[in-house]
Amino acid sequence: MKKYIFLFFAVCAFSVYANAQNRTGDCTSYTSDDRSVTFYLNDSSAIQLRLCSQSTVRIWFSPDGSFQRNNPSFAVVNEDLEDVGTVHVDEQNACYEIFTPKLRIRVNKSPFNLQIFDKYQKLLFSDYADKGHISNGQRKLEYKTLRRDEHFFGLGEKTGKLDRRGEAYKMWNSDKPCYSAVEDPLYKSIPFLMISYLNAIFLENTYKTELNFLT
């Protein structure tokens, strides 16, 4: 059984809806360096894709186009899981594409949209239309495509159903005793999700985050 893991470094929240927002600009150019490819948008934001392995992608969205960390990761010990060789970007009129033996990564230029497929062209992950990355004042939101038969498992010690679909959870520790069977947040945040399409997401983010799986 093959699994694909996508790692996220972003100031964001996953949602299905929101109020008035500004979407990101269109993708205009890119640079590549070793394992990483950085795509630049015409609103000064940027998104960086780093191939940790042939089936693992680190996705880092930066609203200001800067990719500087204040501290080393508290969770990821080693990003480079295996040799991926030289990363090549195939530029087409409407998109950029990156291929590995296991993945096809597509970056649509206008509107900006990120999609990841397996080697059989089955869609594993996709931004929702042109709303993949949204700014709403100080809030940053991420909208992803939710399929009718998609289910989510994980997030560690959380209340509620084993299948997280239809629920919303906060990633913000709260050491509250005597909690109920449906209370959230709790004392620990483990932002790792296993998805029924045989892929997984790890969200590395120190900001207060809400994961919303409502249909």
What do the PLM-derived regions correspond to, one by one?
Residues 4-13:
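Sec-dependent N-terminal signal peptides
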Residues 19-215:
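N-terminal accessory segment at the very beginning of proteins
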